[in-house]
């Protein structure tokens, strides 16, 4: 079937919206993703070409996660801390000079958004008695948290199967507080910009595995608050808000993310009721389980394997990149990196392989030189200084012979 010219011309914009909304990359959306990547790689839209340059991304190696962790957060930043119309103008302009100027403006807005969110997250955690975050930077926006430190770090992993937004939403092992120490939900009201409360809620839910609600003043004169919600621990937010609807001015969303307006005078009653509802429903759904798609010896992770994995692209929510249990590594080095990550150098029989464990600062203290380990990882490649090398995005580790995860994903169909 020959697609109309306008469909192909607009596919890049449809792709960005699809990925930013964490829509499943299946069916029509998978076609949108494939066509959108082709259009983005063509460089036909000056605004996006300029934004890719600011993000340090090569057009010919773009992945969906580059969109979700680097491009979408930058476009969203214009509306969160500035004027959303600037992002629209960037996408529509045909003037390369205007595109460069707007991309610079949006890049500054994104840096400002990251700093505002960083400070707000520290304030929110302090008010909830949770202590400072191990990584106070804003987390992945497509996971409902907010593009920031993770977003830029992940640009360095230019993988055939880059890390998925769904994987980024999993709680970071080094930062999660044991369940008995936490309330059933994290509910807080503060004085923050409306545009970032969803980022704060997402990061709290991500770090602590509990539903999080963050509210701020929408209209001081009328006493109206606006709140953003992100789910955790199996709580269906849409259902929970229906059970509180008599207290709300309006509400909307789905099971994992929602929002509402409420009169400030009704906030205490809402908070008490929502905490009660959450206490009844926390854990009603079993937590997500890490899965293994393939067990492979370390020496067999090569470019032939990457090419085979690449046939599954584009990968994303609903069509995740394969998890590999890679066996037979020896630790050469494990060191903490900026943003709460751990960088790894792992030896196999013929050479060494680089790895990065996003939001796993605990691994830097757990692993020692000479440790023999197996890893749960996604395999990709990294291009630096004109050279390409294999790199692993490490999700979990275990002592050699004790695989980090043994539950296999059921075959499709």
How would you describe each model-predicted region?
Residues 5-265:
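Hydrophobic helix-and-loop "lid/oligomerization" segment in the mid-to-C-terminal part
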Residues 266-271, 363-364, 369-409:
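OB-fold single-stranded nucleic acid-binding module
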Residues 76, 309, 377:
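A residue-level signal for conserved active-site and pocket-lining positions in enzyme catalytic cores
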């Amino acid at each position: 079937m020959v697609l109309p010219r306008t469909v192909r011309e607009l596919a890049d914009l449809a792709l960005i919206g699809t990925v930013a909304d964490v829509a499943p990359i299946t069916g029509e959306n998978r076609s949108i993703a494939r066509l959108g990547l082709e259009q983005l790689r063509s460089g036909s839209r000056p605004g996006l070409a300029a934004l890719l340059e600011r993000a340090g991304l090569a057009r010919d190696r773009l992945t969906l996660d580059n969109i979700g962790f680097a491009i979408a957060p930058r476009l969203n930043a214009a509306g969160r801390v500035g004027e959303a119309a600037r992002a629209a103008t960037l996408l529509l302009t045909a003037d390369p000079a205007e595109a460069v100027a707007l991309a610079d403006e949006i890049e500054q807005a994104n840096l400002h958004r990251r700093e505002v969110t960083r400070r707000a997250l520290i304030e929110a955690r302090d008010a909830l008695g949770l202590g400072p975050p191990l990584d106070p930077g804003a987390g992945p926006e497509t996971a409902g948290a907010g593009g920031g430190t993770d977003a830029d770090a992940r640009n360095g992993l230019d993988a055939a199967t880059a890390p998925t937004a769904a994987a980024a939403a999993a709680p970071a092992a080094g930062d999660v507080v044991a369940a008995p120490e936490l309330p059933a939900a994290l509910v807080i009201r503060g004085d923050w910009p409306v545009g970032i409360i969803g980022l704060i809620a997402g990061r709290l839910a991500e770090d602590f595995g509990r539903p999080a609600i963050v509210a701020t003043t929408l209209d001081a004169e009328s006493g109206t608050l606006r709140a953003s919600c992100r789910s955790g621990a199996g709580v269906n937010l849409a259902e929970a808000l229906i059970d509180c609807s008599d207290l709300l001015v309006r509400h909307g969303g789905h099971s994992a993310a929602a929002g509402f307006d409420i009169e400030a005078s009704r906030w205490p009653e809402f908070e008490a009721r929502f905490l009660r509802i959450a206490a009844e429903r926390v854990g009603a759904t079993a937590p997500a389980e890490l899965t293994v798609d393939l067990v492979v010896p370390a020496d067999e992770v090569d470019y032939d394997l990457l090419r085979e994995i690449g046939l599954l692209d584009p990968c994303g929510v609903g069509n995740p990149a394969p998890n590999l249990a890679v066996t037979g590594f020896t630790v050469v080095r494990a060191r903490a990196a900026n943003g709460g990550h751990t960088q790894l150098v792992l030896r196999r029989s013929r050479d060494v392989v680089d790895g990065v464990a996003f939001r796993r600062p605990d691994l830097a203290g757990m692993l020692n030189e000479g440790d023999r380990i197996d890893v749960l990882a996604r395999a990709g490649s990294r291009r630096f200084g004109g050279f390409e090398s294999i790199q692993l995005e490490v999700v979990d580790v275990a002592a050699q012979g004790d695989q980090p995860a043994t539950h296999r994903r059921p075959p499709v169909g």
